[in-house]
Amino acid sequence: MSGARLHTLLPELTTRQPVMVVGAAVIDVIADAYALPWRGCDIELKQQSVNVGGCALNIAVALKRLGIEAGNALPLGQGVWAEIIRNRMAKEGLISLIDNAEGDNGWCLALVEPDGERTFMSFSGVENQWNREWLARLTVAPGSLLYFSGYQLASPCGELLVEWLEELQDVTPFIDFGPRIGDIPDALLARIMACRPLVSLNRQEAEIAAERFALSAEITTLGKQWQEKFAAPLIVRLDKEGAWYFSNDASGCIPAFPTQVVDTIGAGDSHAG
């Protein structure tokens, strides 16, 4: 399918299976940096904005704007950051299934270099404090597509989330590991992959995955070896070059379609959405 054809199909998307988004809503403090900080330095940043973000929230917003209904399990706390997030979600017509948790939501400092490359420094909040009581509130319908972020899977609550995933029947996990793919313990990562999730990786994450799983760094070979090893679908996002997809019965590359770049924060999340 061409990128142009895909672009024309976006307004016609409909919900074909239940969707639940499990993850984080946080505050992004975005600043321009002429260079990344080095040890002992003192550099001046130019603040762009203070935005509501988080991988799961970006996906929830993208789905809502595409007309795709989803259950959103994005823990909201009781604090300044949480209230800002709650108000933003309300403006987007979104509610969270996990609300009024004890504590505040986390925040992230995003440094944007002149070429658009992003570097993140994160401070955790209630979004990484999942517990059994929260999970018991979630009703996951059979056949659901269930999104997880690597940020939560690599956090102290990752073990609990994977246990919950293993208990569910007839669901398709969609996992965007993000940069945390290198931080998840081997044993836990093996259990995640045993659930045969649909995994989405960007260019850098694919390189990390190839090294970690002893696979080829060449994209098409990586996709083939991934199928042989995990029997699970894989998406590799190559920014302006489009995205490769691999499954047991098909593979190919979808070219990117031209668009006006507003900013690069949340680009991968929007693609997942």
Predicted regions and their residues:
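Conserved phosphate-binding/catalytic loop of the ribokinase/pfkB sugar-kinase fold
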Residues: 110-156
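Conserved phosphate/ATP/ADP-binding segment of small-molecule kinases
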Residues: 164, 169-174, 178-252
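Conserved phosphate-binding/catalytic region of the ribokinase-like
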Residues: 2-19, 44, 211-273
